[in-house]
Amino acid sequence: MTQKPEELPTHDVAGRFAAPIDQTPHEPAHWEKEADAIRLLLADKKRQIFTTDESRRVQEALDAETYWKLPYYERWIHGFSSLLKEKGVLQEAELVTEEARLRATGEDKVEDPPGHHHHHHDHDHDHDHDDHPYQEDDDAGIAVLSPLQLRGRAVRNLLVARGILSAEEIRAQIEAMDSRGEHLGARVVVRAWTDAGFAARLAADAGAAVEELGLSRGETVLTALFNTPAVHNLVVCTLCSCYPRSVLGRPPAWYKSRAYRARAVRDPRGVLAEFGTQLPEGTSIRV
């Protein structure tokens, strides 16, 4: 049974937001890349400290005002720091102590070159007006990390000190994500276009097929969808912005945005047109 929009949980934005989709490319700030890396490492097969579902549970328990106020990766920091405390890996007192040390030593300062402003490119906490797809950038020009950004740094330091993560692992994870992107997806598509056998293997087992090209299948099931003249596929995650990171890297800002996650479900044809894809009326769209 379909719920009325006002009855949907805060985090499930399907169909509830009509703003335009901001397609402006944005380069992640270092603290965002680091939060992304820490979250993935803590949940990997080596450590298995928590699951994606547990991380979602903590974030989805936030009240609506807080949920939409926090930038995407600050919600991630809230999620993994809360779970580390819940599971007894870290204690609140030691986090507070480390945060105080960081402030005392000046390590709570934003380290950007003069005149550079990084953006919360993955804001999906848009206000409810159609002409404002992203909240105004709130760290451009500031000099101090926000409380959750500082907590992320404190978590990192404590995990490294205890040997749960290493600085090298975090750096390698960031570099791995930096190296992935649309160019790798294009390699897969071109190979499928030019090699019917590979296309068949890609359809049957996308993870194994991309490994033929030296790419990673990742730790989740990778699936390839094939467009035809009759059916065009549009992929969206209305809950947590799931994305084929093992090939494409970090999801772009527009994919995580509140506008895309809401409108792709309700108006897929309009969303595709906004990205420059005009489909014949006879082509079905599968979301």
What do these predicted regions represent?
Residues E34-R39, D44-K46, R57, E169, ...:
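Short, amphipathic alpha-helical interface elements at domain boundaries
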Residues E34-D44, R75-E86, R153-A161:
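Short, hydrophobic/amphipathic alpha-helical patches that form generic packing surfaces
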Residues G15-A18, D22, E32:
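Short, surface-exposed polybasic-aromatic patches that bind anionic ligands, especially phosphate groups
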Residues T51-V58:
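Amphipathic, hydrophobic secondary-structure cores in small proteins
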Residues Q23-E27, A43:
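Acidic, low-complexity/disordered tracts enriched in E/D and polar residues
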Residues T2-Q3, E7-T10, A14, I38, ...:
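Non-catalytic ligand/cofactor/substrate-binding and regulatory segments of enzyme domains
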